[in-house]
UniProtKB/Swiss-Prot annotation:
Amino acid composition bias (Polar residues), ranges on this chain: 10-39, 58-72, 302-327, 776-788, 842-859
Keywords assigned: Cytoplasm, Zinc
Function: Involved in maintenance of polarized growth and daughter-cell-specific transcription.
Top-rank taxon, per record: Eukaryota
Gene expressing this chain: ZRG8
Stretches with biased composition (Acidic residues): 334-353
Cytoplasm is among the record's keywords: yes
Family named by the database record: Belongs to the ZRG8 family.
Name of protein: Zinc-regulated protein 8
Location(s) in or outside the cell: Cytoplasm; Bud; Bud neck; Bud tip
Feature: compositional bias, Low complexity: 40-57
One cellular component term from this protein's GO annotations in UniProt: cellular bud tip
Basic and acidic residues biased stretches: 797-819
Length: 859
């Protein structure tokens, strides 16, 4: 500290003395390596040029050893103080940073307070070597290597170039070095340069880059390779980096403006002929597209001779690949025009299979760039597997089974001709006697009759069975006709010839307007008519519901039959109603046809007769009236096969209507929905509450039985057993209140809104030093006590039942006098002494400590 004060005093005595400046020259003095700083001179880098100027110390100094420039004494004293402090606090790297900081302040101080006659000295290699020698003693020695191979284009110089890693390069030197390559980190490069100079040089390089004239490719490649390998000045380095940066950011507008250094597309490619080439290429591509479309649309002529094909039938085609190869095209032009890579191919001189597909930049701190070429891989098609069925098993993309390929099978979708517009024209032909009805599949050729499967006689015949046998609807037709003949053999064979069976129901593939008889002698146009078989039907006579008691006599099956028999008897609104289609032969087929025809909106019903003029007279029987369906009226409503609906009966004698004096209930009101819903609430049985109550009284049904059933009380539970035993222990209330109490407390597990414990109440009370036990002692009421009452007795009463007249044992209410009732009696103001029996019954005896009835009681 004393040396610091002493040096500070000496430095202050030298300030402001102009007499100390002498004309004698003082050589450049360099301090020792311990001071690690040179005060002999300073260098200043001018912003307008790349030259480095050195300012020397004036020669007329009296004492060169004690010389210190202005504003430097504080630094000198601080530097000495820092050398005396141990090196652990100030490491060598931090010391170098301080030296660099104060070196800059020294240059600024000398530039501001310079002597009157300074002398400038040009830069020389000796001065630069001295500065480098001082830094080489401190910094890490450099590492040299040799470039053996590189990506991209090789230089014309050839040979192996030497690279130097971590070269101790001073920021003061601006001379070119052929051995040097800028491979230092980006932070060090940016720290060695001033921001103002870098920004000025960047702008200058951008202007020079845009204003450069068009040069040849060879000269441009040589200059570019020389700049990359041997960058002479920071200006060239910045220009190369800026160009590389511009090549990374390429848009639609900058595609033809910037020079792509990586792909070597030079400026001489960009010329005024570029727009013309694009127009020609676009026109050729459009022509090729049109010709390819015309080629695809052209149907090949199978009957044409080979000579005709050679002469003129061969169409000219131009593919996209051939079009792109005929004209020079830049890489990326197809992307600008919106064309895919699969349709166009670019021809480049540098495209070779041996070259790398990666792009590499020289003199970049981070090395290889992230830009690379990606190749799209075709995604494999996922196969669809459904229970070991592959995608070729007639499944479409929506996982629906395709039935179009199964035309030979009998499916509902293959039974009708959709949109047969020529049905009107063929009506006259169908009326001919020799008219033959053909199937839909007749145009495909004669139908081969499938072999009938063998009958199963042995176990091995089971393996010969197959599902591939075609279903023939004629088999079903023959089976039905055979059943009809068998059923009608008994005296009804004469009606078979007159009975018309609609063949469309049995064989839907045939014409809908033609009908055949069993003898195949008469073919005429008629509406579909079905005559039912008159089979005897046994009806169960059910007593109609006239009272509330009749509801319990109904069975489920009887109730259903009762509703079905009386549902449809008469005609309503002039419409014919089909009674029960499932009881008629072929009625199910009619409903199935009705469902299938709803899907086909193009089905025509123009030729179905609306009146009965064309029907034969022998068919107009009264028995058939109820089964004839008037199709004309139903077509107006639904434009389809008529719906089979049921009409409620007109006579409602079985329904009990409410009296006018009674209150109207909710289910008696008719709503709009009642007319649409069959079997609405107005058809339900009316329940009279007065009649219901009389029925319950008549049969002895009370509300207590319903409550016991709700509370899950067992049927064999007899309340009198517990009532007789517990009657003395009950509270002495009136007997009339016990019924309501039992209705509310008849079940112990009835949910209440409180927490409870189902464990029985303990009969002992445990205290700190003893246990008190309570015993339930049965006692008989004594006449001397203040209580009076009688126990209930059983009485047998015979009741005559109106229906079964059986004797029932009922628990009668106990007989009681008017004077004696349950409850406290009025005292007679005569108090008697308690008898010993009373004291024995109602007094608590002392607890025996020796033995106790409770095992855990204390002794």
């Amino acid at each position: 500290m004393r040396s610091f004060i002493k040096s500070h005093k000496n430095s202050n005595s030298l300030d402001g003395s102009q007499s100390r400046w002498n004309n004698s020259e003082v050589p450049n003095v360099q301090r020792s390596s311990a001071d690690s700083f040179n005060y002999s001179g300073s260098t200043v880098i001018s912003s307008n040029s790349n030259t480095v100027t050195s300012m020397s110390i004036p020669n007329n100094l009296p004492n060169s050893k004690n010389y210190s420039p202005k504003h430097t004494p504080s630094f000198e004293s601080f530097h000495r103080l820092a050398n005396k402090i141990p090196s652990k606090l100030f490491k060598k790297s931090s010391n170098n940073a301080l030296n660099a900081t104060y070196n800059n302040s020294l240059h600024l101080g000398e530039s501001l307070s310079s002597p009157p006659t300074p002398r400038t000295i040009n830069t020389s290699t000796d001065a630069i070597q001295k500065v480098r020698s001082t830094e080489s003693e401190i910094e890490i020695p450099s590492i040299k290597g040799t470039i053996t191979h590189s990506w991209g284009t090789r230089s014309d110089t050839g040979g192996h170039s030497i690279i130097v890693l971590n070269e101790p390069r001073s920021s003061l030197s601006g001379a070119s070095n052929s051995d040097y390559s800028d491979l230092e980190p980006a932070a060090r490069i940016s720290g060695l340069k001033r921001p103002s100079i870098v920004s000025i040089k960047t702008n200058n390089s951008f202007e020079e880059y845009n204003s450069t004239p068009i040069i040849t490719e060879e000269e441009d490649l040589k200059n570019f390779d020389s700049k990359i390998i041997n960058p002479s000045t920071p200006n060239d380095i910045n220009a190369v980096k800026y160009n590389n940066r511009k090549t990374q950011i390429i848009g639609n507008e900058n595609l033809f403006r910037t020079s792509n250094l990586q792909n070597k597309v030079r400026k001489h490619f960009i010329s005024p002929l570029e727009n013309l080439n694009e127009n020609v290429l676009e026109a050729d591509n459009k022509q090729g597209v049109v010709e390819n479309v015309q080629r695809k649309k052209k149907v090949p002529n199978l009957n044409a001779s080979p000579q005709d094909t050679i002469d003129g039938n061969r169409s000219r085609t131009i593919s996209f690949a051939e079009t792109s190869k005929t004209l020079p095209q830049m890489e990326g032009a197809s992307d600008a025009d919106g064309e895919s890579d699969s349709c166009s191919e670019t021809t480049d001189d540098d495209d070779d299979d041996n070259t790398s597909k990666f792009s590499f930049e020289y003199n970049r701190p981070n090395g290889r760039t992230a830009s690379m070429k990606y190749y799209s891989k075709p995604e494999p098609v996922n196969n669809i597997y459904i229970d070991d069925l592959y995608e070729d098993e007639n499944f479409d993309e929506n996982m629906n089974y395709d039935e179009d390929s199964l035309d030979g099978f009998e499916f509902p979708s293959n039974k009708f001709d959709y949109g047969n517009e020529n049905s009107d024209e063929n009506d006259d032909i169908q009326g001919h006697e020799n008219y033959v009805v053909q199937d839909n599949n007749s145009s495909k050729g004669p139908k081969l009759k499938s072999e009938a499967p063998k009958k199963v006689q042995t176990y091995n015949d089971l393996f010969d069975l197959s599902d591939d046998f075609d279903y023939d609807p004629s088999d079903e037709y023959q089976n039905e006709t055979r059943l009809i003949h068998e059923m009608c053999e008994d005296g009804e064979a004469s009606q078979i010839d007159n009975m018309m069976v609609d063949e469309n129901i049995i064989s839907p593939q045939k014409s809908l307007t033609s009908s055949k008889s069993f003898n195949n002698s008469n073919v005429s146009k008629s509406s579909p008519l079905i005559k039912p078989l008159e089979t005897p039907k046994k009806k169960i006579i059910v007593k109609p519901v006239a009272s509330f008691a009749d509801i319990f006599n109904l069975d489920d099956e009887e109730d259903r039959d009762f509703k079905d028999d009386d549902s449809c008897n008469d005609e309503s609104d002039g419409e014919y109603v089909l009674k029960d289609p499932f009881n008629i032969p072929g009625g199910k087929n009619l409903l199935n046809r009705h469902k299938s025809l709803k899907k086909n909106s193009s089905f025509s019903l123009k030729k179905i007769p609306s009146n009965g003029d064309s029907i034969d007279n022998n068919l107009m029987d009264k028995k058939l009236d109820k089964y004839i369906v008037d199709i004309n009226k139903s077509i107006k409503k639904h434009s389809d096969i008529p719906d089979l609906h049921f009409v409620p009966p007109d006579n409602s004698s079985d329904i009990i209507l409410p009296k006018r004096s009674q209150s109207l209930k909710y289910h008696d009101l008719s709503s709009i929905l009642d007319s649409d819903v069959p079997g609405s609430t107005r058809d339900l049985f009316f329940i009279d509450e007065a009649e219901e109550d009389s029925y319950n009284v008549k049969h002895g049904l009370t509300e207590e039985e319903y409550l016991d059933e709700i509370n899950n009380v067992p049927e064999d539970f007899y309340f009198s057993d517990s009532e007789q035993d517990m009657s003395p222990m009950k509270s002495p209330f009136r007997r009339s209140n016990t019924g309501s109490f039992r209705r509310t407390h008849s079940f112990s597990g009835k949910p209440i809104g409180a927490a409870k414990d189902n464990t029985p109440v303990k009969s002992k009370l445990e205290i700190k030093n003893k246990t008190v036990t309570f015993f339930n002692h049965p006692w008989t009421p004594n006449s001397q006590s203040g209580f009076s009452g009688k126990s209930p007795k059983k009485s047998i009463k015979k009741t005559d039942n109106l229906e079964n007249s059986e004797e029932e044992h009922l628990l009668a209410t106990p007989k009681r006098d008017d004077s004696s009732a349950y409850g406290f009696s009025t005292p007679d103001r005569q108090f008697r002494k308690p008898t010993p029996e009373y004291l024995q019954d109602y007094s608590l005896s002392p607890i025996q400590e020796g033995y106790s009835s409770v095992d855990n009681s204390p002794r």
